[in-house]
Structure formats: structure tokens, C-alpha cells
């Protein structure tokens, strides 16, 4: 059995790490490289960096900090932000990232997933999906350009249908960002995760809502996700990585020890 992954998420805006609630009202958390070094030292399995405004500003993520991060950590890390072509993906990967993640650009051109996965392998192609429960439609819908509230809008894609589509196109992994839960620290959306798990044949990562050790356990156990991603609880030291792993292992989870 493959070990479940504990992943720290670092949202990047103008060269610093930020964090908001439900993808809004972001506040500065700290500098990129020191935080990356800290998490690697504390025993995190993987890091994910989202340049949250790169796509809306029509620019590629700044590669200088990617190179700097690669020099100070020895764990896998994924980078997202304005990747719109195979050449963009090449630039990010050649700067030191182990994986690239695309979101809005995949919604614009789903074939981009295929092009990148065929060039570099499915193992380094992650699809981020920003899912919001629309009460009027009584369905989870995919949101686009979520890095800028003034440009965010709801697509015509139901989350479940988009999950199927990106797998057909060559996604190697899916990060399901549950926007209704983001930053609230009240737990992951277990029901939504469990439904997506049924149709997701590639590694599935839960994102949005972690506030305690129990929340991580619930997502791993009840929804059988392959990894759990969090930001606020790690940034604010609400949950210590070493303690989290120790408690999950004690409850029978296959987790890499610190």
C-alpha cells in the first residue's frame, strides 16, 4: 500500500505566501523560501505552491523563487500559476519543480493536459479543480480564475463531469479544492470527496477545511483520498506535522514517519 501524503499548500502572491478564506481576503503569511525550508524540516511529505494571480494577470509564475526553493528542500514540490503551454510547463519543471499543476488553462483547452502529459509523463501533471456548491443548482460546480475575486466565475462544468474529463485527457493527479470549506478549519467536505473518489481513478488530494487532526483522519479514512492538503493549520501551528503524523500512524494510517 502506498503511503498517504501530508501536503502543505503555499499560496503565493507578488512573491510572498498569503492565505485567505474561501479564496478571498488574503493576508501575508511570510516569505516563500523560509517557509518551504521550515515545512521540509518539520517532515511534510510534499509542498504545493499556487501563484494565485498569475493566470488572471496573464503571466507565468516567477521562476526565480522556484529555483531558490529547489536548492533548500529535498522533498517533492508542485507549482501552479499561469502555465498555458507545453513550453511554460518545461520552464517550470526545468527550474526545479517536480510537478506542475494547471487549472484555468485546462478549462480553456482540455487538450493541454494531454500535450503536457505526453511530453513529460502523467506523473508530473496535476489538475487543480476549484469546486463550489451551487445551492440554486443543487450541484457542485467548477469555478475558474479563482485567484482574483473580480474575475472569478462559475463554469458550465459540474465537478463530477470535469473530473471524468481531465482523467480522459491524461491527468496524473487531481487536487480537489472545496471552496465552501476553504480556510474555515471546520473539516473537509467528506460527502463531496467520497462521491468524487468513486469516479477518480488517479491519485486524489483533498484540499479545503482542515482544522484538526481528526479532520485529516476523516478525509483519509472515510473518503480514502491519497493525500490531504492544508495551509492555515500549518501556517498558524494549529496542527504540528510531527504530531499529526504520529497520531495518524497510531490509528492505522500508512504514513511516512518524520
Swiss-Prot record:
The lineage of its organism: Bacteria, Pseudomonadati, Pseudomonadota, Gammaproteobacteria, Enterobacterales. InterPro entries: Aldolase_TIM, His_biosynth, HisF, IGPS_HisA/HisF, RibuloseP-bd_barrel. It is an enzyme of class 4 (lyase). GO terms for cellular component: cytoplasm. Gene3D superfamilies: Aldolase class I (3.20.20.70). Its EC number is 4.3.2.10. It comes from Buchnera aphidicola subsp. Acyrthosiphon pisum (strain APS). This is Imidazole glycerol phosphate synthase subunit HisF. One of its GO terms (molecular function) is lyase activity. Belongs to the HisA/HisF family. The active site is at residues 11, 130. One of its GO terms (biological process) is L-histidine biosynthetic process. It catalyses: 5-[(5-phospho-1-deoxy-D-ribulos-1-ylimino)methylamino]-1-(5-phospho-beta-D-ribosyl)imidazole-4-carboxamide + L-glutamine = D-erythro-1-(imidazol-4-yl)glycerol 3-phosphate + 5-amino-1-(5-phospho-beta-D-ribosyl)imidazole-4-carboxamide + L-glutamate + H(+). Keywords: Amino-acid biosynthesis, Cytoplasm, Histidine biosynthesis, Lyase. CDD domains: HisF. Heterodimer of HisH and HisF. It is found in: Cytoplasm. IGPS catalyzes the conversion of PRFAR and glutamine to IGP, AICAR and glutamate. The HisF subunit catalyzes the cyclization activity that produces IGP and AICAR from PRFAR using the ammonia provided by the HisH subunit.
Amino acid at each position: 500500500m502506498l503511503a498517504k501524503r501530508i501536503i502543505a499548500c503555499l499560496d503565493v502572491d507578488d512573491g510572498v505566501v498569503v492565505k485567505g478564506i474561501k479564496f478571498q481576503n488574503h493576508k501575508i503569511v511570510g516569505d516563500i523560501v523560509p517557509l518551504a525550508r521550515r515545512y521540509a524540516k518539520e517532515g511534510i511529505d510534499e509542498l504545493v505552491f499556487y501563484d494565485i494571480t498569475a493566470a488572471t494577470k496573464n503571466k507565468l509564475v516567477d521562476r526565480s523563487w522556484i529555483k531558490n526553493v529547489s536548492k533548500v528542500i529535498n522533498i517533492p514540490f508542485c507549482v501552479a500559476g499561469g502555465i498555458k503551454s507545453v513550453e511554460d510547463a518545461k520552464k517550470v519543471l526545468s527550474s526545479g519543480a517536480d510537478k506542475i499543476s494547471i487549472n484555468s488553462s485546462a478549462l480553456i483547452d482540455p487538450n493541454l493536459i494531454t500535450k503536457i502529459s505526453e511530453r513529460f509523463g502523467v506523473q508530473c501533471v496535476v489538475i487543480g479543480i476549484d469546486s463550489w456548491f451551487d445551492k440554486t443548482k443543487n450541484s457542485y460546480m467548477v469555478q475558474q480564475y479563482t485567484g482574483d475575486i473580480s474575475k472569478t466565475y462559475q463554469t458550465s462544468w459540474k465537478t463530477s463531469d470535469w473530473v471524468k474529463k481531465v482523467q480522459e485527457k491524461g491527468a496524473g493527479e487531481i487536487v480537489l479544492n472545496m471552496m465552501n470549506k476553504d480556510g474555515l478549519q471546520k473539516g473537509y467536505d467528506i460527502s463531496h470527496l467520497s462521491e468524487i473518489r468513486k469516479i477518480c481513478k488517479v491519485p486524489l488530494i483533498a484540499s479545503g477545511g482542515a482544522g484538526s487532526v481528526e479532520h485529516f483522519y476523516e478525509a483519509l479514512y472515510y473518503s480514502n483520498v491519497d493525500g490531504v492538503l492544508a495551509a492555515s493549520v500549518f501556517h498558524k501551528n494549529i496542527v504540528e506535522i510531527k504530531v499529526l503524523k504520529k497520531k495518524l500512524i497510531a490509528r492505522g494510517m500508512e504514513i511516512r514517519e518524520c
